[in-house]
Amino acid sequence: MSAQPVDIQIFGRSLRVNCPPEQQDALNMAAEDLNQRLQDLKVRTRVTNTEQLVFIAALNVCHELAQERLKTRDYASNMEQRIRMLQQTIEQALLEQGRISERQDAQFE
């Protein structure tokens, strides 16, 4: 489906952006999140320049994204390591099971 124009409000300004209909709710939630971030920054920093607030918010979001990427990378690496350990454990168990089966077969001959 093609993108449709959607009007959103960010920090008192109207913006019209193109958005696929199935992502419109996510866009509205993102706009609400950005509005809240900007409002919180304005109160916390006492900065009144909207452009400066937007840049600070953008830097904060980029930093959060970088942190989440690192956590995801660390998690994936940890899972890969655990999978390798499980594979080794399973392979070892299968080898031992094979040895036990060979001994049992030899006893019956």
From Swiss-Prot:
The keyword Secreted does not apply. One of its GO terms (cellular component) is plasma membrane. It comes from Yersinia enterocolitica serotype O:8 / biotype 1B (strain NCTC 13174 / 8081). One of its GO terms (biological process) is division septum assembly. Pfam families: ZapA. Belongs to the ZapA family. Type 1 subfamily. NCBIfam families: PRK10972.1. Keywords: Cell cycle, Cell division, Coiled coil, Cytoplasm, Septation. Homodimer. Interacts with FtsZ. Residues 22-99 form a coiled coil. It is found in: Cytoplasm. The keyword Protein transport does not apply. It comes from the Bacteria. This is Cell division protein ZapA. Activator of cell division through the inhibition of FtsZ GTPase activity, therefore promoting FtsZ assembly into bundles of protofilaments necessary for the formation of the division Z ring. It is recruited early at mid-cell but it is not essential for cell division. PANTHER family: CELL DIVISION PROTEIN ZAPA.
